[in-house]
Amino acid sequence: CLGENVPCDKDRPNCCSKYECLEPTGYGRCYASYYSYKKKTL
């Protein structure tokens, strides 16, 4: 488990259960990979 705000692979998500792998803001221009973010609890 890597934690929050670290690069992750959306095809092989190894984020913890409380995190999800999402495109960061500026993906493709500033960032080349997905990052793990805290899941928004509803």
UniProtKB/Swiss-Prot annotation:
Tissue specificity note: Expressed by the venom gland.
Segments crossing the lipid bilayer: none
Main location: secreted
Signal sequence annotation: none
Disulfide bonds: 1-16, 8-21, 15-30
A GO CC term attached to the entry: extracellular region
Subcellular location, record wording: Secreted
GO MF, one example: sodium channel inhibitor activity
Alphabetically ordered keywords of this record: Calcium channel impairing toxin, Disulfide bond, Ion channel impairing toxin, Knottin, Neurotoxin, Secreted, Toxin, Voltage-gated calcium channel impairing toxin
Summary of the function given for this chain in its UniProt record: Inhibits voltage-gated calcium channels (Cav) in rat cerebellar granule cells.
Record family assignment: Belongs to the neurotoxin 14 (magi-1) family. 08 (Ltx-4) subfamily.
UniProt comment concerning the protein's domains: The presence of a 'disulfide through disulfide knottin' structurally defines this protein as a knottin.
Full protein name: Omega-theraphotoxin-Asp3a
Species for this entry: Aphonopelma sp. (American tarantula)
Native organism taxonomy: Eukaryota, Metazoa, Ecdysozoa, Arthropoda, Chelicerata
